């Protein structure tokens, strides 16, 4: 119904309000159901403190407070109408709806599905707690500005059994989904269904709902009265799962009517697709209910072309629409009579089949939506102008209500204070929060931290219209806090203390650091921020520890599967630093679908990193021997490698290649720029004692960005021998300086450099040695690939591209 209203709303704006006390999985499902119809801006989540289920008396204070918190959220959305599709809920869970007793600046319209508990108090309201809950809800229900009933029968019940006047009650009918339809199944599919559910070629279908008003005993009794040849030809199939006690009771009942157990077939659990198939395949569908608000099963069956028989009381005549197809559900002889006629009178049976399609076509969600929208329009036309000041008054009065609830603990009150703040949507400026949880604690000056530093710098400098840009960090055992002390130390201006972050609707967390060590603990924080309406987005630099675990330390090998699975299941967006990484991430999630259950809202995209050292908050300073080193570079062809030394980076292979070249008498220099990393102890020891060290081999650690620029400018070419990268910043930095590049032929380098680099393959030293010689030959002829033709971005452009991958809402769109 709600989707149809949105689809047919025309000039009217529709928003949805989601209960933030529900699990993040439920919230995901709701947002997923509407994402093709509504923008994120029109999906609101209200915060409150759970549990609120009325069945536990200890929850009653929180329940009242949750209703007040919801009112504050609604007041900040400022709708004309609040449409409550299901009102009598919340006894067994934290479902929260209410109709204010005071004057509020919106109209409340409730859907009435039925008043069955009210009309059958002995059966349904025997429990004092549930009776109190239901009657309290009924009193609220009567305060609604309008009631939309799903049938004329339900509307009449409202008029007769409540104090709601008839001019406030409207029948909007109901419908079923488009999935319920006549389907021409293949013979193979039909046979598989028969095998799965032990179905005969022809059968009578009814629903095995073990609930008194569903009257399951009556069709079984009537079936037992059919002629033996009809019973033999048409076994009775009872759809849906029945608990063992109920099953045994039905079987004993059938035996008391003279039926054998084999004449009844129980399907057990049915998927929607299989139920639709059974509707299509059955000879006859029988629905003997004693009381319905509408009666979806007969409509479902008729939409599938089934010859349908049903009760002639409450709402079912409206649905079935033909007196001859109905029976008195209290009279088994009447049920038998109509069933037998349908099974023996071919003309009547053909009429039943034809009527099913004609009658079911009268019901659609579009029709229901139009009736509802017309009802909304009439309600608003009869309403007086709303005083804008009433919105603020609602917030004030609801806070006062919360303050007077004695049953709330101090923890409850603190949670409600946060909830009230989150629900004040109007008061918020949206926030773009850059997660620098690693950088804020220690800047190790790795490539990833250079990315974090550069992106943060650009976002702070350029700003994002409609958003406050801040840096945040997470400390295990605490909450997210603003990284104001870090900003004060590294950027102009004063930023204050590291206060806790209040995440609210449309805020965006973008984690540019690699924070695998924080998972899975930080997941609770991520779920909480998303349950407040914020978005959790993460930059993924690579997943090499998952693809090539031998390249990583054991701790990283353990952390990465946890990290990426948590991101897949709990993040909104994964923004990878290259298309290659994005494809790898999507492939890994698919490969591990047996245990990784991704958030249905998750998107995986990519952007490219920047490379202008001047804009990355570069470090400065020149070593004492800088001029001597630069002179050495100029004296002979010099090749440079840049990056932390790790097994995958190819330093050992490159060194061995140059050793071969030196043995051949080649006068080439190799400059290795990068500190010692993991599992390269023997290589580093070899470097420290190498006979060519500081002659033709140079190892420079912890140099400044300023000196690196000078080295780039004087090198003949960059050698990037890495066997795996997420992006490869040195490649872009070299291209920016027009430094030619000799690189390994791997997908991500092909994506970035395309034909503008000299590629090599293989893991033997001779492979790199040959690549260097071949490249030099081209270089001497001025025919080598030109790295300046590689497309690269400034950090400003990279940050802008990152923003395009975030759920940014333009300022003009904010109401």
From Swiss-Prot:
One of its GO terms (molecular function) is glycosyltransferase activity. Residues 431-804 are annotated as: Alpha-(1->3)-mannosyltransferase. It is a peripheral membrane protein. Its EC number is 2.4.1.-. Transmembrane segments: none annotated. GO terms for cellular component: plasma membrane. Its main location: membrane. GO terms for biological process: O antigen biosynthetic process. This is Serotype-specific mannosyltransferase WbdA. It comes from Escherichia coli. The gene is wbdA.
């Amino acid at each position: 119904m709600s989707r149809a209203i949105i689809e047919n709303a025309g000039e009217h704006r529709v928003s949805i309000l989601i209960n933030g006390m529900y699990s993040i999985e439920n919230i995901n499902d709701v947002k997923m159901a509407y994402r093709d119809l509504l923008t994120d801006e029109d999906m609101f989540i209200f915060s409150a403190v759970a549990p609120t289920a009325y069945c536990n008396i200890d929850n009653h204070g929180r329940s009242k407070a949750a209703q007040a918190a919801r009112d504050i959220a609604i007041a900040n959305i400022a709708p004309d109408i609040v449409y409550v599709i299901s009102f009598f809920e919340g006894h067994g869970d934290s479902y929260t709806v209410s109709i204010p007793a005071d004057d509020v600046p919106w109209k409340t319209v409730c859907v009435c599905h039925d008043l069955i508990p009210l009309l059958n108090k002995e059966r349904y309201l025997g429990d004092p707690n549930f009776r109190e809950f239901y009657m309290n809800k009924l009193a609220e229900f009567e305060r609604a500005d309008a009631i939309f009933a799903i049938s004329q029968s339900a509307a009449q019940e409202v008029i007769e059994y409540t104090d709601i006047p008839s001019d406030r009650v409207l029948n909007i009918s109901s419908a079923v989904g488009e999935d319920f339809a006549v389907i021409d199944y293949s013979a193979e599919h039909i046979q598989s269904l028969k095998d799965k559910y032990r179905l005969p070629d022809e059968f009578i279908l009814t629903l095995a709902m073990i609930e008194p008003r569903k009257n399951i005993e009556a069709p079984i009794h009537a079936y037992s009265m059919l002629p033996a040849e009809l019973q033999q030809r048409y076994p009775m199939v009872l759809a849906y799962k029945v608990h063992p006690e109920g099953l045994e009771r039905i079987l004993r009942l059938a035996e008391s009517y003279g039926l054998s157990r084999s004449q009844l077939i129980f399907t057990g659990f049915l998927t929607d697709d299989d139920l639709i198939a059974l509707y299509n395949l059955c000879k006859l569908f029988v629905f003997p209910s004693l009381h319905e608000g509408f009666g979806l099963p007969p409509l479902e069956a008729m939409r599938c072309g089934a010859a349908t028989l049903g009760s002639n009381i409450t709402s079912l005549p409206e649905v079935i629409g033909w007196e001859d197809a109905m029976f008195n559900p209290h009279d088994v002889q009447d049920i038998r009579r109509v069933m037998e006629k349908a099974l023996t009178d071919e003309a009547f049976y053909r009429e039943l089949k034809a009527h099913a399609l004609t009658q079911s076509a009268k019901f659609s969600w579009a029709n229901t939506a139009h009736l509802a929208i017309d009802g909304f329009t009439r309600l608003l036309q009869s309403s007086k102008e709303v005083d804008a000041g009433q919105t603020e008054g609602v917030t004030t009065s609801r806070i006062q209500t919360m303050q007077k609830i004695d049953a709330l603990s101090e923890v409850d009150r603190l949670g409600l204070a946060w909830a009230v703040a989150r629900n004040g949507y109007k008061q918020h400026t949206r926030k773009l929060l850059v997660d620098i949880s690693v950088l804020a604690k220690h800047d190790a000056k790795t490539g990833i931290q250079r990315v974090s530093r550069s992106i943060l710098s650009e976002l702070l400098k350029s700003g994002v219209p409609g958003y406050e840009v801040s840096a945040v960090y997470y400390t295990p055992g605490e909450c997210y806090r603003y990284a104001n002390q870090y900003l004060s130390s590294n950027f102009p201006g004063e930023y204050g203390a590291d206060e806790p972050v209040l995440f609210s609707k449309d805020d965006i967390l973008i984690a540019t650091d690699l924070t695998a060590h924080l998972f899975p603990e930080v997941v609770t924080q991520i779920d909480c921020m998303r349950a407040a309406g914020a978005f959790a987005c993460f930059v993924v630099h690579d997943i090499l520890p998952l693809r090539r675990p031998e390249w990583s330390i054991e701790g990283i090998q353990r952390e990465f599967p946890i990290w990426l699975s948590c991101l897949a299941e709990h993040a909104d967006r994964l923004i990878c630093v290259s298309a290659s990484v994005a494809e790898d991430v999507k492939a890994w999630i698919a490969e591990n679908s047996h245990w990784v259950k991704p958030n249905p809202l998750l998107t995986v995209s990519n952007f490219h990193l920047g490379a202008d050292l001047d804009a990355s908050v570069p470090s400065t300073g020149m070593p004492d021997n800088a001029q001597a080193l630069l002179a050495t570079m100029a004296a002979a062809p010099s090749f440079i490698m840049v990056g932390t030394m790790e097994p995958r980076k190819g330093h050992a292979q490159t060194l061995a290649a140059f050793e071969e070249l030196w043995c051949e008498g080649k006068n080439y220099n190799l400059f290795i720029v990068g500190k010692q990393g993991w599992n390269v102890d023997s290589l580093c020891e070899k470097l420290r004692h190498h006979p060519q060290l500081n002659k033709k081999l140079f190892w420079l650690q912890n140099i400044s960005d300023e000196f690196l620029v000078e080295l780039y400018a004087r090198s003949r070419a960059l050698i990037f021998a890495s066997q795996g990268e997420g992006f490869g910043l040195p490649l872009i930095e070299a291209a920016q300086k027009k430094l030619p590049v000799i690189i390994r032929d791997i997908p991500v380098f092909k994506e970035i450099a395309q034909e503008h680099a000299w590629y090599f393959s293989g893991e033997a030293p001779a492979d790199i040695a040959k690549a260097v010689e071949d490249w030099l030959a081209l270089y001497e002829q001025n025919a080598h690939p030109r790295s300046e033709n590689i497309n690269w971005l400034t950090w400003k452009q990279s940050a802008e591209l990152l923003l395009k991958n975030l759920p940014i809402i333009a300022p003009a769109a904010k109401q």
